[in-house]
Amino acid sequence: MSAIYKLSIQGIRSFDSNDRETIEFGKPLTLIVGMNGSGKTTIIECLKYATTGDLPPNSKGGVFIHDPKITGEKDIRAQVKLAFTSANGLNMIVTRNIQLLMKKTTTTFKTLEGQLVAINNSGDRSTLSTRSLELDAQVPLYLGVPKAILEYVIFCHQEDSLWPLSEPSNLKKKFDEIFQAMKFTKALDNLKSIKKDMSVDIKLLKQSVEHLKLDKDRSKAMKLNIHQLQTKIDQYNEEVSEIESQLNEITEKSDKLFKSNQDFQKILSKVENLKNTKLSISDQVKRLSNSIDILDLSKPDLQNLLANFSKVLMDKNNQLRDLETDISSLKDRQSSLQSLSNSLIRRQGELEAGKETYEKNRNHLSSLKEAFQHKFQGLSNIENSDMAQVNHEMSQFKAFISQDLTDTIDQFAKDIQLKETNLSDLIKSITVDSQNLEYNKKDRSKLIHDSEELAEKLKSFKSLSTQDSLNHELENLKTYKEKLQSWESENIIPKLNQKIEEKNNEMIILENQIEKFQDRIMKTNQQADLYAKLGLIKKSINTKLDELQKITEKLQNDSRIRQVFPLTQEFQRADLEMDFQKLFINMQKNIAINNKKMHELDRRYTNALYNLNTIEKDLQDNQKSKEKVIQLLSENLPEDCTIDEYNDVLEETELSYKTALENLKMHQTTLEFNRKALEIAERDSCCYLCSRKFENESFKSKLLQELKTKTDANFEKTLKDTVQNEKEYLHSLRLLEKHIITLNSINEKIDNSQKCLEKAKEETKTSKSKLDELEVDSTKLKDEKELAESEIRPLIEKFTYLEKELKDLENSSKTISEELSIYNTSEDGIQTVDELRDQQRKMNDSLRELRKTISDLQMEKDEKVRENSRMINLIKEKELTVSEIESSLTQKQNIDDSIRSKRENINDIDSRVKELEARIISLKNKKDEAQSVLDKVKNERDIQVRNKQKTVADINRLIDRFQTIYNEVVDFEAKGFDELQTTIKELELNKAQMLELKEQLDLKSNEVNEEKRKLADSNNEEKNLKQNLELIELKSQLQHIESEISRLDVQNAEAERDKYQEESLRLRTRFEKLSSENAGKLGEMKQLQNQIDSLTHQLRTDYKDIEKNYHKEWVELQTRSFVTDDIDVYSKALDSAIMKYHGLKMQDINRIIDELWKRTYSGTDIDTIKIRSDEVSSTVKGKSYNYRVVMYKQDVELDMRGRCSAGQKVLASIIIRLALSETFGANCGVIALDEPTTNLDEENIESLAKSLHNIINMRRHQKNFQLIVITHDEKFLGHMNAAAFTDHFFKVKRDDRQKSQIEWVDINRVTY
C-alpha cells in the first residue's frame, strides 16, 4: 500500500525560488498550522500537482510560480519534489519542474521535464520517466488510486472543496470519474464489436463445413474399395499358410538339431566369456599403462608412499603462502610509487604551463618597451634581451617626470600658499571677529543654559554600555572579518564567472552552428523539387530492398523451400535465376532415375521373405533354457542383487571389501596420530598439524568429538566387523558366478539367433523399406517439382524483376545526387531537409541544456553574491554597534569637560566683544586687495599642472604594467627552470624504480605459478600412486583368467560345431525351395497391395485429414456459436456486475456518511445526509446515473443543494470526502483537509475534531493511513487531542522578506 513521506517546495507562490522548504508527513497524523496567507494551502496544491500534474484552480498564466516582480528576476525556476512509497512497497521520488519567463510586456509559463525515480532495497536509483504526460499517468498507478480520487478526494483544493454540492452536471462528471464509468462502458462496447465480427466468421464457417462434408463422403467410397481389395489378399493368405506349415516341419527338425548343439556350445561360450573378460582387463591394463607413470615398486612400497604423501603437500602449501606474502608487499610499494609519479606529473604540468606564461610575458615586455619608446622617446637603444636595463631606465624616467611635476606644483604652491595665507588670514580674521562678535553676544546666555542642561543630563545619565560589552563586540567583529576574508580568498565568484563565460562561449559556437544548418536548410529548400524527387526515389529503393529482403528471407527461412532450393547467406543475386533453372532440370532427371530403381527393387523384395521362420524356432528353445537358469539364480541371489546387476554388484562388493580393508589398515596406521591430535586439542586448543588456535568453541567441540570417535576401541571393532561382512557377502556372490557364465552363454546364443533373425528381417525390411522409400522419394520429388513450379518460380521471377527496378532507381538516385552535389558544398554530403532538420533539432536540444546549465551557474553565483552581501552587512552592523558603544563611553567625560569649558568661556566673552568690533573694519579693506592678486596666480597654475599630470599618469600606467610583468619573468627565471628540470629527473627516476619493481613482481608471480603447478603435479602424483596399485591388481586378475582358458577342451567342441553346421545347411536349402514357391503367391498379393496403396495415397493427398478438418471446422463453427452466446451472457453479467458494484459502493459510502454525520453534526435540523444515484436511461452504451446530495428532516428527503447553510456545506463536503477516501482509497490511505473549520460554529468544530480523532484511532494501525490537517485554529488541535497521535506539528510563516517558511514545532507548545 502506498504512502507519502516527504515534500520539497521551491519557487511556488510565496515560497522562495532560491531556497527549498521541506515537510515530512508522519503516520497517522500530520498537522500544518499557520496564519492566513502564510502559504498553508500551497502545500496541498504542490501535493496535487506532484501526483496528478494539474495546476490549482484559477492559476493560469504562471501565477502558481513565485512572482518575478518581487525578486526582480526575469527567469524563475520552480520545483516540487515528492517522495513516496508505491502500492507495491517501492520507494519512489517524483519531481516536477516549471519555469516563468518575464518579458517586456508579457510572461511565459513553461512546464519543464520532470523525473520519476525508483529506489531499490540496495539504494540504486533508476529513472522510470521524464516526460510530464507519462508522469501524469504513471504516478497515480504507482500510488494505487485513480487520478479522480487524488484530485477530488485526497488532495482536494480549498476552492473546490464544496464540489459535492455543486451543480448536477459537474457533480455527475466527478462521480463518473470516481467510479471510472467510461472504462466499463468501453468494455461493453468492445464485447458488442467482437460479437459483430464473430457473426461474419460464423457465416463463412458454415460454407466451409458444407464443402468439407462432400469431400468426406468421397473419402468413404474409396475406403470401401480398399476393403474389397483386402478381402482378395486374405484369400491368398490361406494358400500361403499351407506352404508355411511345411516350412514349420523343417523348422522343427532344425530345432532338434539345435538342441544337440548345446553341450559343445557351453564350452565355447565359457571360453568366449573368458576371452571377453581377458580382453576387457587387458584394455584396462593397457589404458592404465598408457595414462600413468609406471613405478617399479612392490604393492606394499606403493601403499607406504601414498600414506606419507600428505606431509609433502603441506610443506609446499606453506612455501606458496610465503611467496604470496612477498607479492603483496611488492604491490603495496608499487602503489606508493605510482602515487608519487602522479604527483610529479601534475607538478611537471604546472611548471610547463608557467614556462609557457614566461615566454608570453617576455614577448609582452618587448611590446611594452616598443610602445613606451614610440610614445615618450625616454629610452636609449637597448636590446630586448636586456630587460633589467629597460626597467632601470623606465624607473629613472618615471622619477624624473614625477619630480618635474612635483617641482612645478611646489613652485606654484609656495607662491599661492603665501598669497592664500595672507588672504586666508584676513578672511579668517574678519570671519572669526564677525562671528565672535555676533555669537559671543548670543552664546553667553546659551552657554549658561547649556551648562544647566548638561548638569541635569549628567545626573540622569545611565551607563548603557561597559568596557566588557565593547570588548565582546570587537571580538565578534574580528571573527566576522576573518570569515569574510577566508570566503573572498576562495575566489568562488570569479570561478563561477569563468564557468559562465566558458558556457556562454560554447553556446555562441552552438548558435553559430545552428545558423549554418538553417542556411543549409534554406539552400536545400531552393532545390526542394530535386530533394523531394530524391526522397521519393530513396523511399522506393528502401521499399524494393524490403521486398527483396522478404523474398530472400522466405527463400532462406521457409523450411519447405530450403529443402528444395537451399541458399547460403552469401549467395550471388545475379546467379539466382540460373541456379533455379539447373535445379529444375535436375529434378526432372531424378524423377526418371527414381522410377527405374522402383521396378528393380520390386523384383528383389519377393525373394527376401522365406528366411524368417526357421530362425524363430531356434530362439524359442534357447529362451526356455534361459528361464530355468534365471529361476535358479533368482532363488540364490541376494535380495538386493538382480541378475543384470550381478557384475556391477560383484565389482562394487569387491571395491567395498577393499575399501573396508583399507579403512581398517588406515585406522590402525593413524590411531597413534589421532590420539596425539586429541591430546593437543584438549590441552592447547590448537591444531596438531598447523598449530593454529581454534576459531571458536563449537569448532573445537566438533573436532574433539570426531577424534574421540576415531580413537575409540569400538570404532576398530566396527571396522573389523565391516570387513568380515563384506568378505562373506563377496564369497556368496562368487559361488553363483558359474551360473552367470552359463546364462551369458545362452544369452550369446540367443543374441546370435536374434542377429540371424534380425538379418533376415532386415533383408526383407530393407527391400520393403527401400521400395517404400523410393515410393516416398517419388512422391517427394513430384511434390518438390510442384513446389518449385507453384511457389519458388514466382518468387525467383519477382526477385529478378525487383533487382532490375532497383538498379534503375539507384542510377536515377545517383544522377540526382550528382546534380545536387553541384549546389551542395557541405562536407557531410547530400542530405535531405528532414535529415538536416533532425540534426538541427539535436543541436537545439544541446543548446537548451547549455542554457539550463548557464542558468544554474548564474543562480549559484547570485546566491554566493547574496551570501557575501549578507556577510558585509553583518560586519557593518557590528562596526556600528562598536562605534555606538565607544561613543556612549566617551559621552560622560565629554559632558564634564563641556560644563567646565562653558563656564570659563562665559567669563572670556565679555572682554572680547569690545576688541572685535574695532578690528573688523580694518581687515575688510586689506582682504579685497589680496583676493585680486591670488586669482591671477591660480589660473596660470591650473593650466600648467593639468598638462603635466596627464603626461605623468600615462607614463606611470605603462611603467607599472611593465614592472609587474618583469617581476613575474624574473621570479620564473630564478626558480621555475630549475624546479622543472628537477621534477623531470625525479619523474624519470621514479619510472625506473617502478620498472624494476614490476620486474620483481613478475618474477615472484612466475614463482607462485610454478609452485601452484608443482602442487597440482603433486595431486597428480598422488593419483598416479593409486592407479599403480590398481594396475598391479588387474595384472594379477589377467594371469588367473589365462590359466582358466588353457584348462578347457576347445578342439572337441569345435569339431561338434562343424557337424551341426553341415546338417543345418541341408535343412536350410530345402527351406529356401519352399520359400521360393511361397514368394510367387506373395508377389500376386503385392500387386493387390499396390492398388490398395494407390488408393491410400490418394486418400492421403487429395483427402488428407478430411475427417479431421471437417471435425475441426465443425467444432470451430460450434465454438464460435457458443462464444457469441457467451458474449451475450458475459455482457449482461458485466452490466449486472457494474450495477451491483455501483450499488455496493454507494451503500458503503452512504453508511459511512450516515455514521460520520450523526457523530459530528451538533444541530437538530438535519437528521442525516446521503448521496442519491438516479438511473437516467438504459441506452445502447449502457446505464448512466445522476447524482445529488440529499438531507433528511423528520424522515422527509430534501435536496441539500440550495437548502443548507455555508457551515453545513463545509461539513457535508468533508464527510463525503472522508467516506469516498475510505471506500476507494484502500491502496492509498492519504487524505488532506484544508481549513476544515471554515464557516463552522464552535460546537460543530468540536464535534468534527472528535470525529477525526475517532477516525484516526480506528485506522491508526493501518500501515498507510495518513491524515493531513491544515488549519489556522490551534484550538482545533486541542479538540482533536492531536498530542495522542503526534509529537509535533509544522508551522508555516513568513520571514522578514515575506517568504514562506516551514518550521517544525513541538506539539506541547500549542496553547489551547
From Swiss-Prot:
BP GO annotations: base-excision repair; chromosome organization involved in meiotic cell cycle; double-strand break repair; double-strand break repair via nonhomologous end joining; homologous chromosome pairing at meiosis; maintenance of DNA trinucleotide repeats; meiotic cell cycle; meiotic DNA double-strand break formation
Entry's EC annotation: 3.6.-.-
Other notes: Present with 830 molecules/cell in log phase SD medium.
Entry domain remark: The zinc-hook, which separates the large intramolecular coiled coil regions, contains 2 Cys residues that coordinate one molecule of zinc with the help of the 2 Cys residues of the zinc-hook of another RAD50 molecule, thereby forming a V-shaped homodimer. The two heads of the homodimer, which constitute the ATP-binding domain, interact with the MRE11 homodimer.
Species of provenance: Saccharomyces cerevisiae (strain ATCC 204508 / S288c) (Baker's yeast)
Binding sites annotated in the UniProt record for Zn(2+): C687, C690
Subunit structure, as described in the record: Component of the MRN complex composed of two heterodimers RAD50 and MRE11 associated with a single XRS2. The MRN complexes dimerize on DNA to form joined MRN-MRN oligomers required for DNA double-strand break repair.
Record-linked Gene3D superfamilies: P-loop containing nucleotide triphosphate hydrolases
Cofactor(s) this protein cannot do without: Zn(2+)
Consequence recorded when altering K60E: Does not affect dimerization but shows decreased DNA-binding
GO cellular component: condensed nuclear chromosome; mitochondrion; Mre11 complex; nucleoplasm; nucleus
Coiled coil: 185-347, 403-558, 640-678, 712-741, 787-1108
Name of the protein in question: DNA repair protein RAD50
Effect of R1201E: Abolished ability to mediate DNA repair
Keyword Ubl conjugation (UniProt): no
Similarity comment: family membership: Belongs to the SMC family. RAD50 subfamily.
Keywords of the record: ATP-binding, Chromosome, Coiled coil, DNA damage, DNA repair, Hydrolase, Magnesium, Meiosis, Metal-binding, Nucleotide-binding, Nucleus, Phosphoprotein, Zinc
Gene: RAD50
PANTHER family per record: DNA REPAIR PROTEIN RAD50 (PTHR18867:SF12), RAD50 (PTHR18867)
